[in-house]
Every structure is written in structure tokens, then in C-alpha cells.
Design a protein with these regions (language model features):
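Alpha-helical bundle regulatory/interaction domains
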Residues: 1-46, 53-54, 58, 70-148
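Short, basic-rich loop-to-helix N-cap that marks the start of a DNA-contacting helix
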Residues: 61-63
């Protein structure tokens, strides 16, 4: 039975949603594109191309954004060091974590932690999450409101 291109595209989208859901659920686990692709019965190249087409970013970029969002929440709590947060969200390298955090948020994690601990007291978590959501593509420095 041959498959139409539209039917194949719908199957790929369903697999991509499962990959995205796995990243959302298991962001703190060691994940790589090869493992995600195996789980979706796709090649790594096909997964990366289709994921980017569907969601506008690579699977790795999406994973790092999820990790940084979670790191921001942990840093706002103020009870963990930057290193502890780095490992809690699944990053193996403090340098990579700090670089990516700074790219997305517009300030280093230590600065964010210091400002957030004092700047969002009494702010509901759901509001803090929206206000402090990472911004992509070097836009953070130009548009990020200060928390303090």
C-alpha cells in the first residue's frame, strides 16, 4: 500500500509531537538527537530537518530552551547555586549552560539569580514564568525587562 505525501507528512508530525513531548518531559535526562530520532523511527538528519520545519528550531535548540526555562524557575527560588541548577536541568557543562543561558536570557545565570531573588517577590509563579520567558536569536539584550 503506497502512502500519499500528505499521509506521510501527518505521520511525521505525530512523531515530531512525540519527540517534542519527550523533550518537555525528560529535559533533565541525557538526550541527544540520535536517541530522539531512534525513538521516532527517523534518521537524525530527517528528524532535525522536519523538527525545524514544524517548530522553527532544531531539536537541540528546543531542548536547551526547555532547560533554560526550568533553570530560570530554579534560580528565582534562590536556594540552589548556579552549578546545582545547571546539573538539575540536565546540562553536563557549566560553561555551555552559562553561555546558552546568557544568549537566551540576556544576562549570566548568577546575575539573573541575584536580580530575580529580590525582583519578583510576591509575583505569582505563572506571571513570573511569562514575564521572564527566554527570548531567542540575540533579542534578549534589546527587549528583556529588568527584574530589579
Amino acid at each position: 500500500m503506497s502512502s500519499t505525501p500528505e499521509a506521510q507528512r501527518l505521520r511525521d508530525l505525530a512523531r515530531l509531537r512525540r519527540v517534542r513531548d519527550r523533550i518537555d518531559r525528560d529535559y533533565a535526562q541525557p538526550l541527544d538527537v540520535e536517541a530522539l530520532a531512534r525513538g521516532a523511527n527517523m534518521s537524525a538528519g530527517h528528524l532535525s530537518r522536519e523538527f525545524r520545519r514544524a517548530y522553527g528550531e532544531s531539536p537541540y535548540s528546543y531542548l536547551m530552551t526547555r532547560r533554560i526555562e526550568r533553570a530560570m524557575a530554579l534560580l528565582r527560588r534562590g536556594d540552589l547555586s548556579v552549578t546545582e541548577v545547571c546539573f538539575a536541568v540536565g546540562c553536563a557543562s557549566l560553561g555551555t549552560f552559562s553561555t546558552r543561558f546568557t544568549e537566551l536570557v540576556g544576562m549570566p545565570p548568577s546575575t539573573y539569580r541575584a536580580q530575580a531573588v529580590h525582583g519578583d517577590a510576591g509575583l505569582p509563579a505563572c506571571v513570573a514564568k511569562q514575564v521572564t520567558r527566554p527570548i531567542r536569536n540575540q533579542e534578549a539584550a534589546a527587549t528583556r525587562p529588568q527584574l530589579a
